[in-house]
């Protein structure tokens, strides 16, 4: 069984390895097989699946991506609630980001946003990923739209007090995307 606290600690400390990722996937798959039969899921199973996918994303362990994508898609089919569903969509978006397959990045990113369970930090990250996907495909008008959404989320974030929206990087990105529209 994947221990969420231990998993998060390994990822943060930088000792997370490809073998750790494969071990987590194997453990999650075994637990999935048992839970899908009984329809009883442990409370933090979705977090364990999410943080496993986050570790794969953060470390770009490409060889682990497809087994984890397959597991997340199975989990969506048996998803016990929408909060868990949101985590699986976010996991899939990040896994597809590792592969560079932009249509799926946008698809799962938007599904995550539509669940209504998106938190601010992940919402900003999701919009940023969508901006990158559209920019990579020369869809600058769409990229600008989601960049503005990302800025709105940050602007309305009480924890982001003191954020300067007029710094060089933000202005350059807006001007660049706007000039391509």
Question: What do these predicted ranges mean?
Answer:
Residues 1-13, 37-58, 82-94, 124-132, ...:
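Amphipathic alpha-helical repeat scaffolds of TPR domains
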